[in-house]
Amino acid sequence: MLRVKGLRVEVEGHEVLHDISLHLPVGEVHALLGPNGSGKTTFIMAIMGFERYKVTRGRILFKGEDVTHLPLYERARRGMGLAFQRPPVVRGVKTRQLVEMCARVEDVDVDAIARELHCEGFLDRDVNLGFSGGEMKRSELVQL
């Protein structure tokens, strides 16, 4: 599903990742571990297409398609997503509002997805405000 080949990444003109390769087949779960400052976040942000993280060499393939030079929103449309370790609280924005905004790209039933992930009880609360760790993760899954 995800293959990274010989990736080199620069941040603000400095090469921070050199010749990184990875293969994550469908149905497998992997963990990316390393000490602080080893490039884990840089690697993930580059894979997702955040502009600050410039891929200078290598390829990123998602479901067999080369997405290396696609913008973040196009990668998201193809099904790529990211869950944060500590997602931000967004006061004044209900989880339902955020999910419905994301759902406009595709025709999806927000309530059906919320039921499937057992999170319909917090759709009308501010995003991540007072959420338990598990609620935050389920909220992120609904948003993806």
Please give the residue ranges for each predicted region.
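Conserved structural motif at the start of ABC-family nucleotide-binding domains
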Residues: 2-4, 16-17
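Short coil-to-beta microelement around the adenine-binding A-loop and adjacent beta1/P-loop entry
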Residues: 14-17, 74
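The feature captures the beta-strand-to-loop junction immediately N-terminal to the Walker
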Residues: 33-35
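Helix-to-loop junction immediately C-terminal to a conserved catalytic motif
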Residues: 48
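ABC ATPase NBD coupling module
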Residues: 54-55, 66-81
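Q-loop/switch helix immediately C-terminal to the Walker
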Residues: 86, 92-109
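Conserved ABC ATPase "signature" region
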Residues: 108-126
